[in-house]
Amino acid sequence: MALLDFFLSRKKSTANIAKERLQIIVAERRRGDTEPAYLPDMKRDLLGVICKYVQIDPDMLSVQFEQKGDDISVLELNVTLPENEESPK
C-alpha cells in the first residue's frame, strides 16, 4: 500500500509551502537571534564616551546582545584598555 500511496499522493500547494517557510522565519525571529536596531548607535556612543577618558581603537570595543528566554536580555561590553595610560588631547 505504501507504494500506491506514493504514486497517488498529491504535491503540496505553493500556498502551504509558503506558509511553512513563513512560520520558520517567524519562529527564528521570535527566538531573538537578531540584535536590536539601536545596538550600532549604542556602540558608537559608548566608544565616544570611553575615548573622552582613554584613547582606544574602535576594534578594542566589543558590544554583544544576547536574549535568554522571553524576559532576560544580556548586554555584554568588553573594552581592551591600552597598557600606557595616555589621556586624550
Curated annotation (Swiss-Prot):
Pfam families, alphabetized: MinE
Protein name as catalogued: Cell division topological specificity factor
Organism name: Proteus mirabilis (strain HI4320)
Family, per entry: Belongs to the MinE family.
Keywords: Cell cycle, Cell division
GO biological process terms on file: cell division; regulation of division septum assembly
Main function: Prevents the cell division inhibition by proteins MinC and MinD at internal division sites while permitting inhibition at polar sites. This ensures cell division at the proper site by restricting the formation of a division septum at the midpoint of the long axis of the cell.
NCBIfam families named among the record's database cross-references: minE, PRK00296.1
Tree of life domain: Bacteria
SUPFAM superfamilies assigned to the protein according to its UniProt record, in alphabetical order: Cell division protein MinE topological specificity domain
